[in-house]
Amino acid sequence: IHLGQNDKSCSEAKKVFGKNFLVGVSCSNSYDLYKKAKEESADYVAFGPAFNTDSKNKEKIDLNIIRKFKSKLKLPFVLIGGINHKNLLSLKSLSPNYIAIINSLWNFKGGPIESAKKFRELLKELKNENDS
C-alpha cells in the first residue's frame, strides 16, 4: 500500500490492514516527512519525482538533498518519477533500494516486456557498479 501526503496516515493504514501488508509513504524530498513516516512505522519511503514526468504535475526534486541525508535513512527507499532507460544509471550514487517506473515501461516502443527486460539488464549493471 502506498500513501501520498494527502492520503490516510501510515498508522491508520496499519490499523486497517494489519501486518500482512507493507505500507510506504511518499516523502517528496523531505527528511522531515521521512522522519514522520518512520515514526508511524512505515515499511518504506519514496522520494520523487526524480526526473520530470508526465505522471505527476510536480517539479522534479533536487537529488542532492537526498544524497545529503541518505546515510541517515533507516528504511528502504524508492525513487520514483520520470525514471527511464537513459537516466537510470545516473541514480547509482543514491543506491535506491527500489525504483518505480510507469511511463517508460508502458509507453516503450518495443512494448512493456521489452522495456522490463532492458530495465533488468540496467539494474544488474547498477547493482554491479554499487557492489564494486
Task: Cite the ranges covered by each PLM segment.
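Catalytic beta/alpha-barrel core
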Residues: 1-14, 21-37, 43-49, 53-56, ...
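Extended, intrinsically disordered, low-complexity segments
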Residues: 125-132
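Glycine-rich phosphate-binding active-site loops on the catalytic face of alpha/beta enzymes
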Residues: 5-13, 46-58, 92-122
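Substrate-recognition "cap/lid" segment bordering the active-site pocket of phosphatases
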Residues: 56-62, 67
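A generic structural signal for alpha->beta connector loops
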Residues: 19-20, 74
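Glycine-centered helix-coil hinge/cap
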Residues: 18, 62-64, 111
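Catalytic cores of alpha/beta
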Residues: 12-13, 29-43, 72-79, 83-101, ...
